[in-house]
């Protein structure tokens, strides 16, 4: 299924996958895999993504 919430939040912040990756210290491929639902990020990485995108863990990682 993927994580469309991260992609939507990233696009709203006008970040490319590469820009988000650099801000959280991972590769662009990691961000791509998270968005595609093919990678389960660590809690530390989840928190980093939330901080950069100005969202909460619930906003981005809680399933509706």
Predicted regions and their residues:
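DNA major-groove recognition helix of helix-turn-helix/homeodomain DNA-binding modules
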Residues: 44-59
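Residues at secondary-structure transition points
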Residues: 1-4, 15, 40, 44
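Residues in the helix-turn-helix
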Residues: 19, 30, 59
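Short basic helix-loop element that most often maps to the first helix and adjoining turn
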Residues: 4-23
